[in-house]
UniProtKB/Swiss-Prot annotation:
UniProt domain HTH lysR-type: residue ranges: 6-63
Record function comment: Positive regulator required for L-tartrate-dependent anaerobic growth on glycerol. Induces expression of the ttdA-ttdB-ygjE operon.
UniProt record similarity statement: Belongs to the LysR transcriptional regulatory family.
Organism: Escherichia coli O6:H1 (strain CFT073 / ATCC 700928 / UPEC)
Alphabetical UniProt keywords: Activator, DNA-binding, Transcription, Transcription regulation
Top-level taxon of the source organism: Bacteria
Matching NCBIfam families: PRK09801.1
Annotated GO MF terms: DNA-binding transcription factor activity; sequence-specific DNA binding
InterPro entries (UniProt xref): LysR_subst-bd, Tscrpt_reg_HTH_LysR, WH-like_DNA-bd_sf, WH_DNA-bd_sf
Protein name: HTH-type transcriptional activator TtdR
Gene transcribed to yield this protein: ttdR
DNA-binding residues (ranges): 23-42
Length: 310
C-alpha cells in the first residue's frame, strides 16, 4: 500500500507534459519553471514507486506505467473539476462557440438531433456542426470535438468511448434469391458488393473479423458511393451486398427487408468522441462529451454491451 496518494497538481503536471511534448512547454502552460515541473514529476514517480517518463534527445515518452497513470489522471482531473463545479455551487454555465464534426450518416441521424437537445439544456452554447466524408485533422479543420466511427485514434488525440458499434454484411432477400449466399469471405469477390467510401476505410477493402482472426477482403461491384444513405437504399432495392453499421440497418433487419450475410463476421466500428484538450480544462467541451455519451448510450447501448470484434 502507498504511504501517500498522488497529488492532483502532480497528475496535472504529467498531463501537461504529455500534451505539450516537453518539460519546458508544460512549465510555460502552467506558469511555472522547468525546475518546478521536474520536481513534481520526481515526487509523483517516488509516490508511485515507478518511472513514468523516459527523456531523450528526441523528446519525452511515457513508459507503460506512465501511460496508465496518464489515462487515470485525465479521468481524475475531470472528476476534480466536476466536484469543484458542484460543491461550490457556482452558477457558471457553459457558453461560447464549440465546433463539432462528424460523418454524414451518423451526423444526420444521431448527432444532429442530439445537438438540438443539447441546446435546449445549454442555450448559452453556440454550436457549429460540420459533416465530413473524410478523416479530418482537428487543428487544420478547426474542430474542437469530432465524433468518429473508427477505433484507430492517433495518440496525439484524446478519445472517449461513446458506445460500441460494429459494421455487418447485409443484403435484401431479393438479391439473395437471385444469387447464392456466400459461404466464405472469399466468395464475396463473386458478388456485387455495394462499396461505401467511409472516412476510415480503404475503398474496396473490407476488413472483417470473427472474434478469432481478422481478414482483409477486396470487393467490387457495379455501384459505389460516398453516401451511406444511398448505399443503404441500393441494398434495399436488391442491388448487392453492403457493409453498414448495425445502428443503421437494425430496423430493416427486424422488418425482414434486409438479412445478415456471413453473420459470424463483422467489423469493429466503435463510436468515439475525439478532442485535443483535456476535459477538465473546458467546461463546454466536458458538457458536450458527457451529453453525447449519455445520448448515444440511451439510444445505442452502453459501451460494455455487445461484443468486440477483431
Amino acid at each position: 500500500m502507498l504511504n501517500s496518494w498522488p497529488l492532483a497538481k502532480d497528475l496535472q503536471v504529467l498531463v501537461e507534459i504529455v500534451h505539450s511534448g516537453s518539460f519546458s512547454a508544460a512549465a510555460a502552460t502552467l506558469g511555472q519553471t522547468p525546475a518546478f515541473v521536474t520536481k513534481r514529476i520526481q515526487i509523483l514517480e517516488n509516490t508511485l514507486a515507478t518511472t513514468l517518463l523516459n527523456r531523450s534527445a528526441r523528446g519525452v515518452a511515457l513508459t507503460e506505467s506512465g501511460q496508465r497513470c496518464y489515462e487515470h489522471a485525465l479521468e481524475i482531473l475531470t472528476q476534480y473539476q466536476r466536484l469543484v463545479d458542484d460543491v461550490t455551487q457556482i452558477k457558471t454555465r457553459p457558453e461560447g462557440m464549440i465546433r463539432i464534426g462528424c460523418s454524414f450518416g451518423f451526423g444526420r441521424s444521431h448527432i444532429a438531433p442530439a445537438i438540438t437537445e443539447l441546446m435546449r439544456n445549454y442555450p448559452e452554447l453556440q454550436v457549429h456542426f460540420e459533416l465530413f466524408d473524410r478523416q479530418i485533422d482537428l487543428v487544420q479543420d478547426n474542430i474542437d470535438l469530432d465524433i468518429r466511427i473508427n477505433d484507430a485514434i492517433p495518440d496525439y488525440y484524446i478519445a472517449h468511448l461513446l458506445t460500441k458499434n460494429k459494421r455487418i454484411l447485409c443484403a435484401a432477400p431479393e438479391y439473395l434469391q437471385k444469387y447464392p449466399q456466400p459461404q466464405s469471405l472469399q466468395e464475396l469477390s463473386r458478388h456485387d458488393c455495394l462499396v461505401t467510401k467511409e472516412r476510415d476505410m480503404t475503398h474496396g477493402i473490407w476488413e472483417l473479423g470473427n472474434g478469432q482472426e481478422k481478414k482483409s477482403v477486396k470487393v467490387s461491384g457495379h455501384l459505389s458511393s460516398n453516401s451511406g444513405e444511398i448505399v443503404l437504399q441500393w441494398a434495399l432495392e436488391g442491388k448487392g451486398i453492403m457493409l453498414r453499421s448495425e445502428w443503421d440497418v437494425l430496423p430493416f433487419l427486424e422488418s425482414g427487408k434486409l438479412v445478415r450475410v456471413l453473420p459470424e463476421y463483422a467489423q469493429s466500428a466503435n463510436i468515439w468522441a475525439v478532442y485535443r484538450e483535456p476535459l477538465y480544462r473546458s467546461m463546454k467541451l466536458r458538457v458536450c462529451v458527457e451529453f453525447l455519451a449519455a445520448w448515444c448510450q440511451q439510444r445505442l447501448g452502453k459501451p460494455d454491451e455487445g461484443y468486440q470484434v477483431m
